[in-house]
Swiss-Prot record:
Phylogenetic classification of the source organism: Eukaryota, Viridiplantae, Streptophyta, Embryophyta, Tracheophyta
Localization: Secreted; Secreted, Extracellular space; Secreted, Extracellular space, Apoplast
Any one GO cellular component localisation term in the record: apoplast
Protein name: Protein PHOSPHATE-INDUCED 1 homolog
Organism: Oryza sativa subsp. japonica (Rice)
Chief location bin: secreted
Gene: PHI-1
Top-level taxon of origin: Eukaryota
Amino acid sequence: MAASSAAFAACLLACALLFQMCVASRKLTALVQDQPITMTYHKGALLSGRIAVNLIWYGNFSAPQRAVITDFVSSLSTPPSPQPQPEPSVASWFKTAQKYYANSKARFPALSLGQHVLDQSYSLGKRLGEKDLVRLAARGSPSRAINVVLTADDVAVDGFCMSRCGTHGASPRSRAGRFAYVWVGNPATQCPGQCAWPYHQPVYGPQAAPLTPPNGDVGVDGMVISLASMIVGTVTNPFGNGFFQGDADAPLEAATACAGVYGKGAYPGYAGSLLVDPASGASYNANGAHGRKYLVPALVDPDTSACSTVG
């Protein structure tokens, strides 16, 4: 979810009539805060225990594109020895979210890669609304799951690029259980300046040269940033009454409150001090599974009430 007015920073909570879900969106405005950021717990339920992250691929994704995102999801958990992720790692970054559970009765969820669902026939068409995203999310597990809908670069989704790069929400309670869901779109052809910064020049603000993406794909590396933000939002505010700042209709969550911040010294138009791969020249801040490198957003550390970057 770019520079001062195009990098992502607020959240939006909307209620769909049919599904009654709470949706938080990674929007397109940047926010670099110097003041303390307090995430208030609103006493709602949190995810707990073992949670499968199921990936629903809508439209055409190449095998290498799917591998980048699949490996990112696998990176969220700390692998057993002898193959730990080099530090700074995606797993260590994700552990910052665990601090939100310190005073909760819930046990911090253990995320694991679940099933893959492929829809390369565009069964719902190439223009999707909120209800369509929910229908797609329902193709994953009905309970103890985060069902992630990933739309290809030729799929138009209501609000995509204009106000958001991704959303998260939850299904209503049912006998089958309840699942959380995430949607993220590939911005490669529609809005890389909004939803793939700093790997593409922003639409607005300072026009610094874009950074080189670590996986060689501007759109998919941008999707990883949005997916990371939305998964943390799902873990800390799954049902709209968890941890957030501000009004429930437009909450700021652990990642979206730090939009546009990826390294120390970040300011609007500058992502911050990042690691650079000497072989490829790619910029990143976290190591992942299978030797992958990723860019993940800063998170609000509840112990310091400030945006915390990796490393």
